[in-house]
């Protein structure tokens, strides 16, 4: 046991052994341990001790030769791989290593014989004579490595100790190629390739089961699909896996097909590819922006796409953005200070809110709607807006239909000149035309009385405060029943009686035909849609009496004319008054006894709105006022408008609209 450290001291001389052993993970030496127990330098002592007969029976010269051959071959292979540039030095190093190995083997055998098998002195003698033979092989050793390398190359696992893979230098692609070439038809299925690997490659012999084959089988599948040298051919039989064949045209193999993975790992290549893609995208975007000014490109873009939100596409968004009634939207156009519902009131859109959807057809045929909804007229009304401090200016009638949203909005106070009907009427200046909310028509006086279906209720009737009506009742005018007898008590409303003088002519259906009424419809309709409960729309006028009996309800004076108007007013009141004067068209502006325009049937629309001759409303109101109405001796029209911007005379104190000078 004292010489055991000597064996350990000899180990540092085997520097080629620990170095390749630390560099290559498949240990090469255990393969030769089966040939002899004395193959490894530390093991001979234990091996010989354990098997003294074997140690004694085995010639020491042969053991030394085996050790010398193995060490020389191993060291030669290692040095040839590590230092391929110096073949001369490789041979010298191999010779030196072989000599050291032979000496170590001889010393080991000699030690064994001397220490453990002292009686067998002959063991020491055969060993020294056998030492010259190892130098002989050493002298012949340079030609030996090719043979040894060839024999090792036959086994895939031992092609080189510095091999790339555990089974040798062959890659998966090389193994697959050999497998396919070994087949008779030069084609194999995937399962057949697996079988060939397990049978032909020693490394995979014990790795054929499912647990240990997942890794290398996955690698084979990866290489089959990665390399272009392998092609997949559909199998003729149904349900059978495809054939894998070698590409007859010759595909790339080796490391070049790995450019995909390399491009991801190699930042320079990946950055280049991304840079090219970014440049291409930028060029496409710049091309689109450059062509964005052309007329054709405006239609090529999808207007709802986020990329199309350029300045020239805001008009597309502004068409439906205001429908959200968002006051915060800057695209929705002018925000009306009157009501939030009127944000969208534009050219020709007023009728969509004045009339319910059921009356859309009739409303679309009204030629005056475009004029009514003229924003200039609306702005003129707003300019003349006068907020009265009178507490009763905006009193909402309680009899108004429940659906009607009466808002105490600014009242249009049209103070007429004192020259109207030659009588100063201070109370008349209190006539306020409050703006009602844009409620759908079912709450509006679109309905005429019982049988007058041709009148579309006062589009813009003017609210008169109940308190003001009382004041007018107490004025010089004769009692209201002298002028209009309440025909329909069910419709009559106590506070909204048509006073002889203050019958506010809500521009009801036909009133556009009556001079200034048309201008009122044009002015007031978009903004002030009469409160049905409060609008004194006594536009019931006998058409034949238009030039003479236009329901000119005198306000303070003009009582002498009431007698002339009684017959014209009282007779037709029980029924809707037909205005037959203008061409005989019969949209009658009816009032229900108390001058309440169409309050009888507010819960529903006229059944024949489509049959109304609304298209005739486009007649020249100016000519009618001046030619027909001014011819009547009983009429005293004054064209000195309080609202000069309004293109309608409103100083006439008729029960119709035109005295809307207030």
UniProtKB/Swiss-Prot annotation:
Record's protein name: Forkhead box protein O1
Protein purpose: Transcription factor that is the main target of insulin signaling and regulates metabolic homeostasis in response to oxidative stress. Binds to the insulin response element (IRE) with consensus sequence 5'-TT[G/A]TTTTG-3' and the related Daf-16 family binding element (DBE) with consensus sequence 5'-TT[G/A]TTTAC-3'. Activity suppressed by insulin. Main regulator of redox balance and osteoblast numbers and controls bone mass. Orchestrates the endocrine function of the skeleton in regulating glucose metabolism.
Region (DNA-binding): 218-225, 241-244
Modified how: Phosphorylation by NLK promotes nuclear export and inhibits the transcriptional activity. In response to growth factors, phosphorylation on Thr-24, Ser-263 and Ser-326 by PKB/AKT1 promotes nuclear export and inactivation of transactivational activity. Phosphorylation on Thr-24 is required for binding 14-3-3 proteins. Phosphorylation of Ser-263 decreases DNA-binding activity and promotes the phosphorylation of Thr-24 and Ser-326, permitting phosphorylation of Ser-329 and Ser-332, probably by CDK1, leading to nuclear exclusion and loss of function. Ubiquitinated by SKP2. Ubiquitination leads to proteasomal degradation. Ubiquitinated by STUB1/CHIP; when Ser-263 is phosphorylated.
Modified residues annotated as Phosphoserine in this record: 219, 225, 241-242, 256, 263, 294, 305, 326, 329, 332, 336
Low complexity biased stretches: 33-62
Polar residues compositional bias, start-end: 316-333
Sequence positions bearing N6-acetyllysine: 252, 255, 269, 272, 281, 430
Sites of Phosphothreonine modification: 24, 340
DNA-binding region, residue range(s): 167-261
Motif Required for interaction with SIRT1: where in chain: 469-473
């Amino acid at each position: 046991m004292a010489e055991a450290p000597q064996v350990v001291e000899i180990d540092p001389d085997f520097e080629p052994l620990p170095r390749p052993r630390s560099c290559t993970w498949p240990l090469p030496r255990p393969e030769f341990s089966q040939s002899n127990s004395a193959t490894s330098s530390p093991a001979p002592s234990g091996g010989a001790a354990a098997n003294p007969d074997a140690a004694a029976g085995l010639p020491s010269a042969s053991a030394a030769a085996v050790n010398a051959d193995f060490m020389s071959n191993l060291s030669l292979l290692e040095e040839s791989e590590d230092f391929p540039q110096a073949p001369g030095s490789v041979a010298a190093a191999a010779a030196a290593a072989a000599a050291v190995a032979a000496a170590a083997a001889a010393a080991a055998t000699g030690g064994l014989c001397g220490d453990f098998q002292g009686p067998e002195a002959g063991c020491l003698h055969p060993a020294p004579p056998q030492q010259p033979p190892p130098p002989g092989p050493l002298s012949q050793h340079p030609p030996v490595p090719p043979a040894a390398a060839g024999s090792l190359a036959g086994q895939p696992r031992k092609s080189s100790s510095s091999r790339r893979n555990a089974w040798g230098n062959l890659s998966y692609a090389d193994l697959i190629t050999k497998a396919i070439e070994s087949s008779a038809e030069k084609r194999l299925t995937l399962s057949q390739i697996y079988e060939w690997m397990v049978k032909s490659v020693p490394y995979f012999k014990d790795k054929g089961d499912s647990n240990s084959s997942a890794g290398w089988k996955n690698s084979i599948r990866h290489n089959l699909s990665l390399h272009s040298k392998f092609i997949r051919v559909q199998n003729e039989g149904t349900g059978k896996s495809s054939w894998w064949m070698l590409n007859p045209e010759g595909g790339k193999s080796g490391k070049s097909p790995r450019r995909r993975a390399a491009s991801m790992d190699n930042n320079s290549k990946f950055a280049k590819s991304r840079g090219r893609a970014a440049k291409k995208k930028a060029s496409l975007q710049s091309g689109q922006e450059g062509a964005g000014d052309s007329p054709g490109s405006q239609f090529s873009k999808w207007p709802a796409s986020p990329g199309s939100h350029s300045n020239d596409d805001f008009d597309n968004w502004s068409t439906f953005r205001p429908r959200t009634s968002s006051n915060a939207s800057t695209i929705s156009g002018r925000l009306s200070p009157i009501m939030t519902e009127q944000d969208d009131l534009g050219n020709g859109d007023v009728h969509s809110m004045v009339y319910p959807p059921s009356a859309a057809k009739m409303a679309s045929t009204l030629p005056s709607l475009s004029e009514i909804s003229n924003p200039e007229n609306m702005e003129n009304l707003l300019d003349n807006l006068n907020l009265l401090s009178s507490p009763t200016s905006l009193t909402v009638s309680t009899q108004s239909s429940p659906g009607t949203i009466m808002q105490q909005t600014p009242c249009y106070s049209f103070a007429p000149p004192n020259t109207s009907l030659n009588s100063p009427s201070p109370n008349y200046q209190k006539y306020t035309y409050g703006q009602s909310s844009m409620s759908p028509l079912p709450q509006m006086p679109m309905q005429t009385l019982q049988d007058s279906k041709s009148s579309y209720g006062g589009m813009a009737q003017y609210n008169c405060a109940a308190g003001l009506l009382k004041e007018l009742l107490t004025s010089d005018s004769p009692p209201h029943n002298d002028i209009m007898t309440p025909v329909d008590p069910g419709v009559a409303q106590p506070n909204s009686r048509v006073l002889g003088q203050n019958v506010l002519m809500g521009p009801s259906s036909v009133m556009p035909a009556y001079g200034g009424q048309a201008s009122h419809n044009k002015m007031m309709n978009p903004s002030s849609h009469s409160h049905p409960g409060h609008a004194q729309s006594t536009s019931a006028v006998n058409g034949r009496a238009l030039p003479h009996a236009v329901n000119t309800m005198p306000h303070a004076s003009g009582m002498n004319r009431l007698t002339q108007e009684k017959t014209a007013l009282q007779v037709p009141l029980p029924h809707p008054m037909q205005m037959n004067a203008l061409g005989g068209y019969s949209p009658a502006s009816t009032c229900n006894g108390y001058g309440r325009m169409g309050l009888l049937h507010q819960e529903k629309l006229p059944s024949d709105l489509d049959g109304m001759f609304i298209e005739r409303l486009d007649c020249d109101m100016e000519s009618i006022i001046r030619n027909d109405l001014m011819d009547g001796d009983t009429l005293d029209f004054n064209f000195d408008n309080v609202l000069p911007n309004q293109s309608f005379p409103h100083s006439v104190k008729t029960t119709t609209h035109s005295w809307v000078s207030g």
